[in-house]
Every structure is written in C-alpha cells, then in structure tokens.
Amino acid sequence: MWRVLFLLSGLGGLRMDSNFDSLPVQITVPEKIRSIIKEGIESQASYKIVIEGKPYTVNLMQKNFLPHNFRVYSYSGTGIMKPLDQDFQNFCHYQGYIEGYPKSVVMVSTCTGLRGVLQFENVSYGIEPLESSVGFEHVIYQVKHKKADVSLYNEKDIESRDLSFKLQSVEPQQDFAKYIEMHVIVEKQLYNHMGSDTTVVAQKVFQLIGLTNAIFVSFNITIILSSLELWIDENKIATTGEANELLHTFLRWKTSYLVLRPHDVAFLLVYREKSNYVGATFQGKMCDANYAGGVVLHPRTISLESLAVILAQLLSLSMGITYDDINKCQCSGAVCIMNPEAIHFSGVKIFSNCSFEDFAHFISKQKSQCLHNQPRLDPFFKQQAVCGNAKLEAGEECDCGTEQDCALIGETCCDIATCRFKAGSNCAEGPCCENCLFMSKERMCRPSFEECDLPEYCNGSSASCPENHYVQTGHPCGLNQWICIDGVCMSGDKQCTDTFGKEVEFGPSECYSHLNSKTDVSGNCGISDSGYTQCEADNLQCGKLICKYVGKFLLQIPRATIIYANISGHLCIAVEFASDHADSQKMWIKDGTSCGSNKVCRNQRCVSSSYLGYDCTTDKCNDRGVCNNKKHCHCSASYLPPDCSVQSDLWPGGSIDSGNFPPVAIPARLPERRYIENIYHSKPMRWPFFLFIPFFIIFCVLIAIMVKVNFQRKKWRTEDYSSDEQPESESEPKG
C-alpha cells in the first residue's frame, strides 16, 4: 500500500499578476431558445450566448449529482454537528456542449441564472449572473493561464490539424453506469477564501463537482456529492504540515466522525497561500473504507477549473489510474487529464489510452464494487425529515434506513417506524455507544498515537468521541530535543526515517556545518530561480536534511540521487529528488524542527520559536501536565484539571476537553471532594449558601436597627443632660 502526493511544479512562485492575463469582463444576456419539460422538471434546454461578439448555441441536459437527501452540515458553538437550515435544489444542474464544437463541454446550474463554465477544446469561459440586474444580464469572462496561450477555434480547424495517432478502442468492457458517492469537507481558511457565506461556498463546491463530472463522462461515472461539511468557526483537525501527514490525520478523524454519513470516499479541501503539493490520496483504494479519502490543497492562485482537474486526478489515482507517460500515452485533446501539467491548461481535458486501460483493469476487479450502487437522485424542492432514509435529520433520534437495512446491520436500538430510540436506549451507534447505552466517561474512545497527541474519553452523555486534541504547539518532546508541531513531534530522527528508511539517524552538527555550507545538491538552504541558496551560518541546521547512515549496503531510492560524505568519522547522507518527485519536500528540514535554544526552523531559516505562540509555563499546570491545543491543562494520571493541583487516585488524567470531566467525587476523601466541588461549581454544595443569604441579610438589618436605636437613646440622654445645664451656664456674668 502506498500513498500518492501531487507536486504542483513551480506553483509556489505563482503570482496572479504575473501568470494570469488581465482579461476583460463581458456582459451578455443569454436567450433561451428551446426547453423540454418532463414531470415538471426542465430536462433539456438550449441558450444562445454571445461570447466576444459572436453568438453560440449551448445545448444542455439535466445532470443530477445531488442525492434526494443531500444536506450541508456545520458545527454549533458547542461542537455538535447540525444540518444547515437551507434548501439546495438538485434539479437545476446541467451538462452539455456548444453547438458546432463537438469536443466542447458545458457545465452550468440554472438555479439562479446561469452559473458555470463553458469549455472549448483549449479555451474556457466562466459565466455567472450579474448581481442586481433586472434584464437577465450575465458576466462572461475568459479563464486563461499564460501557459495556455492559445486561441479559440472551431471543429473544422481541429480536423485540419495533423494528428499523428489514433486512439484504439480501449473502453471498459462493462459499459454500465457507475457512481462515486463523495463527502466533501471545506476547512475554515478555504471557507473564508471562498466568500465566508454558506450559500456562496456551496455553489462553488457544486460547480467544482459539476466540472469534475464532465471529466468522468467517458468512464460513465457520476460523482455524487452525498453531503457537504463546512468548518465555519474552527477546524476539527490540524490542517498544517505536509500533504501526506495531513492525509493520515484526516483518515483517522474520518474513521471516528463520518460513520453516520454514507459515502464511498471523503475529501478534505484545504486552503494554502502557496504550496508545492496540491493533494494526497492512496492509490487504488477507492472502495477501502479505511483508505478511501484524500486531501486537496487549494493554492491561492489557481482557478476552480484547475481545482477540478486536481480533484479528478486524485479520484483517478484512487482508482488505480496512474500518471501518463507522455511518450506512450495519448489522447485526442490538447492535454490529457493524467498529464501533471494539465492543471495549467484551459479548455476540455480527456483521459488518455493509458488511463482507459488502467480503469478497465480497476473496474474488472472485486475492489471496485462501491461504484456499482446507484443512489437516489429524485428531484427535491424542500428538505424534510424522512424516516427510513438512513440519514439523521431534524426531529429524528436515529435512522438506520429501511427495514431490510436495519435488519442487515442488526439494529436493536432504533424504532424503525418512528426513528426514535427504543425504550431504555439512549443511542444507536457511535464510538461511545455500546448496547444502546452511552459508555461511561472513563472509557477511552481515541488513544494518543504519539507523545504530542492526547487521548480522548467518552463523556458519558454522548455517543460521539470528543474532538481530537493534541499537545500545544511549541511544547518540548523527544527527551526535550524536539518540539511538538500540530500534534506531531518534529523529530530529526523521524524525518530521516521517513526519507531514507531504516538504519539512519539525525546527522551530527559536523555533517550540517560541512555540507550545508555548500550550494549544490549535497547541501543548501533551498532552491530559487537563480539556483541553490547558500545557508548562512545561523541557518545551517535548517537547510538540506542530512542524516547519519549506519547500514552496510548502498541505499536505493527511485528517481533520486543519494549523496554520501565521510565527515569526522560519520557517514553523512543527503538526497536530491527530481523537481516533480512526490517526495521532493523531504530533501529539506521541516518547519518547526528545533535548531537551537528557543529557536526553530522556518522556511529554511533558524528563527525564534516565539512565533509559535507557546505560553504554557510549568506553573500553569503545577508541573503535573501539559497544555493542549486549546491552552487548557491536560493533567497526568491522578491529578485533576483545571490546574492539576488536586490529586485523586482513580482519575486517569485528562483535561476539561478530553471528555471525562468533571471527575466523579470519591466519598472516602470528603475534604478533597469539597475542594473539587468548589472548583467545578457543583450545585449540591451551593444551595445551602444561597439559602443562608436571606437569613444573613435579615440578621444584618436587625443589627443595624438595634445599633441605630441604641445610638438614638444615647443621643436623647445627651440632649437631656445639656438642657439641664444650659440655664446655669447662661447666668454666668459676662466679664
């Protein structure tokens, strides 16, 4: 089993102003010239659209890719997932072509005007309704990359070109409809990048899936967007780090949290300001529930059209379709889908003969069975809870599907007629549900997978495991030699093992001083347009990854050059990958690697670790725990949160976020219990206090009255005494 990472050649240096032409936006008014309606739904339509002064006829046919029970999900402020109260129509998405251009592709929605993409063979145009227009005006603009500097031409021009090859018939032997049910997650930064509006973001995801569907027409595959999840307030997992690390983190999260949302494959879409890699997935594992997933990294400068190509390539790789060898693989278009350069080209893209052969091999195997089930694509106009559709909706406590579905999975907790829990049940499924009851709060539901990760426990009142937490970034790890970064110990030894395999360890300082002072394949601090960058003295530990080899045989890494150097008795090794190699980023030290006291590597420079924002002092958790990524103390075993100052022998450790909080009081240790209850504001100890307050107030008032009365009596006595003495005083002679 192996995973595939995408390298986007040169994308890290792309700038919108230097790589994309500034193209004029045109105003057009689409004219509907034909419409066919079946059962109240417009199944076909034709529009006349003017592009650059020339009218084109666009023929459309309805293309459903949203199931009847499609929902968009987000999380509440308490971290509970909930469906958004929005209706999204599934009958207004269309696919078609431009008349006179048989190799053209059109993918638009007509829910609110025409919104989508028109692709000629090598030029693409975007179209969307003009806001606040009263005359059905639309804007249309060319999506053009400088690298695809070609002009629009029609079919007769295509026929006149000298095609040096002809495609053989390599269609899959079983030409039946196939379906890929996909759950898509948009993380917070990409949500903000796409407009920070649920309707706008959903429309863009619909357009992305529509474009991807157009690519897979030749395979007779429909990509079904089974559900959409938006991380609006915060990400549920750390989305930093390299693509392969993020893939593993996502798949672990997916296993715990996506059990209630049926899907064949799940994809996490992540925004990156710039990135060399654009995604990761496991090859040929489309129908393997443990590995059917991928991550798509969306660099700032690419278009939605290019993002669809990336998604299509990832889906293809997960079906065992490999990258094209441009010397052996051919297609009738300007560029083939599985050409790594395809994302740089506008226009229609199709699969090569090699891709057809790979797909035919995949579909002939048992491992492709998940593509054979057809979801319901009935039109829907308003979302309503439907008991028996295997989807948990508003007003339902459970929904295991039809009677046959529930019997198949052995459902015993859910009343299939009412979609309510049976008497005596409080859950039906989930990592913290057992025999229809919530597991007790001391039950671990997600163990830590390494020292910078933290375990989570069932909270005793939910079937779900709490969200994943990890040690705060910046905390020491690896015997205080390294630092935790987003839940992973950024160990030099681990980086060496990941790059070279066994029998390696992190290189000594002599190796770094000698090799990274060079400016060649053996040592450097990165690559720029002018060549290798020389490391300054302070940055030697942050340049090329240099390891110490203790093995006996020469290392073998495909498509890589391994450099050996004997320095001060150490066999130091470095590696040089081709620029388009999936592991090319492993040539250098990762960001977050320690490079000195209170210093870490960042972009091949050794900088202060203060930028990590680590502020967990030993006093905060009384030296009996660590801070988690929410900056709360995760206490060691037998010490209680929130500050790990109180001891309880039966407490397994944890934080206020780990699920097993608050702790159960231990009757044998009454003083400790009182202290704990004061910490957590437990109600049983507070009601006597509130009962005492009115009596205390009354007592104070009575005391005040008594004092005042006593004072008044003294005052009266003083006045009486003064009045008795006054005449005598006045009779004194005035001298």
UniProtKB/Swiss-Prot annotation:
The keyword Transmembrane helix applies. Gene3D superfamilies: Collagenase (Catalytic Domain) (3.40.390.10), Disintegrin domain (4.10.70.10). Sperm surface membrane protein that may be involved in sperm-egg plasma membrane adhesion and fusion during fertilization. Could have a direct role in sperm-zona binding or migration of sperm from the uterus into the oviduct. Interactions with egg membrane could be mediated via binding between its disintegrin-like domain to one or more integrins receptors on the egg. This is a non catalytic metalloprotease-like protein. Residues 1-16 form the signal peptide. The prodomain and the metalloprotease domain are cleaved during the epididymal maturation of the spermatozoa. GO terms for biological process: adult behavior; binding of sperm to zona pellucida; cell adhesion; fusion of sperm to egg plasma membrane involved in single fertilization; gene expression; male gonad development; positive regulation of gene expression; proteolysis. Residues 612-645 form the EGF-like domain. One of its GO terms (molecular function) is metalloendopeptidase activity. SUPFAM superfamilies: Blood coagulation inhibitor (disintegrin) (SSF57552), Metalloproteases ('zincins'), catalytic domain (SSF55486). A tripeptide motif (FEE) within disintegrin-like domain could be involved in the binding to egg integrin receptor and thus could mediate sperm/egg binding. Residues 178-375 form the Peptidase M12B domain. The modification Phosphoserine is found at residue 729. One of its GO terms (cellular component) is cell surface. Glycans are attached at residues 122, 220, 353, 459, 566. Residues 708-735 are cytoplasmic. The chain crosses the membrane at residues 687-707. Residues 17-174 form a propeptide. Expressed specifically in spermatogenic cells in the seminiferous cells. Not detected in fetal tissues. This is Disintegrin and metalloproteinase domain-containing protein 2. It comes from the Eukaryota. It comes from Homo sapiens (Human). It is found in: Membrane.
